[in-house]
UniProtKB/Swiss-Prot annotation:
Protein species of origin: Mus musculus
Keyword Ribosomal protein tagged: no
Family under the similarity heading: Belongs to the cation channel sperm-associated (TC 1.A.1.19) family.
Ranges annotated as biased composition (Polar residues): 147-160, 245-271
Mutagenesis or variant effect for T270I: In strain: 72
Cellular component per GO, a single term: plasma membrane
Function: Pore-forming subunit of the CatSper complex, a sperm-specific voltage-gated calcium channel that plays a central role in sperm cell hyperactivation. Controls calcium entry to mediate the hyperactivated motility, a step needed for sperm motility which is essential late in the preparation of sperm for fertilization.
Extracellular side: 374-382, 436-446, 511-521, 535-551
Catalytic reaction list: Ca(2+)(in) = Ca(2+)(out)
Description of the deletion phenotype: Mice are normal but males are sterile. Male sterility is due to defects in sperm motility unability to fertilize intact eggs. Sperm of the CatSper1 null mutant lack CatSper2 protein, while sperm of the CatSper2 null mutant, lack CatSper1 protein, suggesting that stable expression of CatSper1 protein requires CatSper2 and vice versa.
Listed name of the protein: Cation channel sperm-associated protein 1
Lineage: Eukaryota, Metazoa, Chordata, Craniata, Vertebrata
């Protein structure tokens, strides 16, 4: 096998889809042309963009002689720019330089029909009845085929071999043949370009779907695509192809050759067709690029929007997550604080805490009493200071715990207010001592000298003992009575002070000269009258003033003593006693109320029990009640006694029934008698 056949086989192995497997057993040989002479026609189109064209009729059985295509342009990059659009005007004009009769090597003539556009806009497919007649001598598979008029020859491949080799290929590969045609950059050839419409192109080939049946390319310098009509005996092959143009198909499939004479007109047509092709391709490519750029920009904008939304969602999620974390922490802290508050409240209200504070107050009172002794105060000054600091720390801790447990409710209790005031005074005392130890000059400041007065307020801590002795009922009642008597006592003390002021003014005006030591001014006079409330030294006042000739002081002093001592002081005592009595009565009444409540609760429980029993009895049937009644009344009788008692009861019931009938009959008789007498009186009157 020569070089051309080997190239052909390698091409079909690379493009196995270029042949239709339906022609696997075609009986007629067909030469495989390689080169074309310049003045010979023969056009083959295998372009899905442009459809099929009617091919020249060829005579099988001799040497095929074809025109060699003239090279019009040179394409450096034939794979990207190989658009072979054939001129529609040239095809309509039927430009061809093929001779009508060419001698065949086997003694037969090979008539070639004029190339025409199959399925064109004006003429349909024309079929020559003399087309493809077989001559006397058939093709021999081993005979070489040559082109006498061409510049080169090759060992051709018979039609049978061609079909045997190509029809075993895959139909899918056959369809891919048009998409994978490659061109060499050194290939130069002439083409006639023509824009084709999306029309149907017939292909006559024995009712087989034959796409690219003879579309093959010589793997030499010039790729040629042919599409021919063949008449094999009586078999006529006819096929209609429908194709739609696209940019990729224009670039790889629209390769057709139309044999034209090398003329200036053909060159112009070819150039115009190429320009039209490149313009259409550039427009399509520009539109595709614009659409792709729009899609890319839209996709980028959508991606940016998606990223922004995702970032916003992430930020919102982070904020919500942070807020949830803070809320969770706050809830946990609040829960812990609430639990701590409840624990502290239970601690401050416990009996052990009250007992501990009571012991501390008692010890503090003992220390205050011990500090009154000069010798003990001098020797145990350091110890007393340490103990005072410990007591102060305990008082502060108590106040803080109660403030945490009760909050502002701590100040609603007067005893708590007293405790807080004592604690503040103790803190001031401690601060004054510390300032005195640091700087004596600063301690002598007027402000701290005023605060030093409150140091004596430590004695009020002893009152805490009364507060801590609340476990004693009687003492608690006395303290409650005193607190309840304060308004009345305050009113009485106000009257006493008013009376004291009036008597001070009068006594100073009358006895200033006779007794200047006691009645010199209003303050000395007030002090003298206040000491007289105890009835002390009033006789000495009378003696000194009588010696000075002021004997009339006696009635004034007597009036003052009666008003102040016998009236107002007794009023205070009366108020206290009355309040104590009221407190006792309230206590007794409270006890009675508690007893009555207990009795009422017991009665309520009994009534509920009776109601429950009544409900249980109500649920019992009448027969059960009768049986219960009988068992209660006659449970201790024998059977004979019960029978006799039953008969007795029956007789008693019968007697009562007859008595009832007798009464009713007697009533009727009485009515009749009364009516008779009334009727007789009426008749007698008439």
């Amino acid at each position: 096998m020569d070089q051309s056949s080997r190239r052909d086989e390698s091409y079909h192995e690379t493009h196995p889809g270029s042949l239709d497997p339906s022609h696997q057993s075609h009986p007629h040989p067909h030469p495989h042309p390689t080169l074309h002479r310049p003045n010979q026609g023969g056009v083959y189109y295998d372009s899905p963009q442009h459809g099929m064209f009617q091919q020249p009729y060829q005579q099988h059985g001799g040497f095929h002689q074809q025109n060699e295509l003239q090279h019009l342009r040179e394409f450096s990059d034939s794979h990207d720019n190989a658009f072979s659009h054939h001129s529609y005007q040239q095809d309509r004009a039927g430009v061809s330089t093929l001779p009508n009769n060419i001698s065949h090597a086997y003694g037969g003539s090979h008539p070639l029909a004029e190339s025409q556009h199959s399925g064109g806009p004006q003429s349909g497919p024309r079929i020559d009845p003399n087309h493809h007649p077989h001559q006397d001598d058939p093709h021999r598979p081993s005979e070489p085929l040559s082109h006498p008029s061409s510049t080169g020859s090759h060992q051709g491949t018979t039609h049978q071999q061609y079909h045997e080799r190509s029809h075993h290929l895959n139909p899918q590969q056959n369809r891919d043949h048009a998409d994978t045609i490659s061109y060499r950059s050194s290939t130069r050839f002439y083409r006639s370009h023509a824009p084709f419409s999306r029309q149907e192109r017939p292909h006559l080939h024995a009712d087989h779907h034959h796409e690219g049946h003879h579309a093959h390319s010589h793997h030499g310098e010039h790729p040629h695509h042919k599409e021919q009509r063949h008449y094999h005996g009586d078999h006529m092959h006819h096929h209609i192809h429908h194709r739609s143009p696209s940019a990729s198909q224009l670039s790889h499939k629209s390769h057709s050759t139309l044999a034209t004479s090398p003329s200036h007109v053909g060159s112009k047509s070819t150039a115009s067709g190429a320009r039209y092709t490149f313009g259409a391709r550039s427009q399509i490519f520009g539109k595709a690029q614009s659409r792709e750029s729009l899609r890319e920009s839209a996709s980028l904008s959508e991606g940016e929007d998606h990223v922004q939304k995702r970032k916003k969602a992430q930020r919102a999620h982070k904020k919500a997550h942070t807020g949830n974390i803070f809320q969770l922490l706050w809830e946990k802290i609040s829960h812990l604080l609430l639990g701590l508050q409840q624990m502290i409240l239970s601690l401050t209200q416990s009996l052990g805490f009250e007992t501990f504070i009571f012991i501390v107050v008692c010890l503090n009172t003992v220390i205050l009493v011990a500090q009154t002794f000069t010798e003990l105060e001098i020797r145990g000054e350091w110890y007393f200071m340490v103990l005072d600091s410990i007591f102060l720390s305990i008082y502060v801790l108590e106040a803080v715990l109660k403030l945490i447990a009760l909050g502002l409710e701590y100040f609603y209790d007067p005893w708590n207010n007293l405790d807080f005031f004592i604690m503040v005074m103790a803190v001031l005392d401690f601060v004054l001592l510390q300032i005195n130890s640091l700087s004596y000059s600063f301690y002598n400041h007027s402000l701290f000298r005023i605060l030093k007065v409150f140091k004596s307020m430590r004695a009020l801590r002893a009152i805490r003992v009364l507060r801590r002795l609340s476990i004693l009922t009687s003492l608690h009642e006395v303290a409650g009575t005193l607190s309840g008597s304060l308004p009345s006592i305050t009113a009485i003390l106000t009257l006493m002070f008013t009376c004291l002021f009036l008597f001070s003014v009068v006594l100073r005006a009358l006895f200033q000269d006779s007794d200047p030591k006691r009645f010199q001014n209003i303050f000395t006079t007030l002090f003298t009258l206040f000491t007289m409330l105890t009835l002390d030294d009033w006789s000495l006042i009378y003696i000194d003033n009588r010696a000075q000739g002021a004997w009339y002081i006696i009635p004034i002093l007597m009036i003052y003593i009666v008003i102040q001592y016998f009236i107002f002081l007794n009023l205070v005592i009366a108020v206290l006693v009355d309040n104590f009595q009221m407190a006792l009565l309230k206590g007794l009444e409270k006890v009675k109320l508690e007893q009555a409540a207990r009795v009422h609760e017991k009665l309520l429980d009994d009534s509920l029990t009776d109601l429950n029993k009544a409900d249980a009895n109500a649920q019992m049937t009448e027969e059960a009640l009768k049986m219960q009644l009988i068992e209660g009344m006659f449970g201790n009788m024998t059977v004979k006694q019960r029978v006799l008692h039953f008969q007795f009861l029956q007789l008693v019931a019968a007697v009562e029934q007859h008595q009832q009938k007798f009464r009713s009959q007697a009533y009727v008789i009485d009515e009749l008698v009364d009516m008779a007498f009334e009727a007789g009186d009426d008749d007698y009157g008439k």
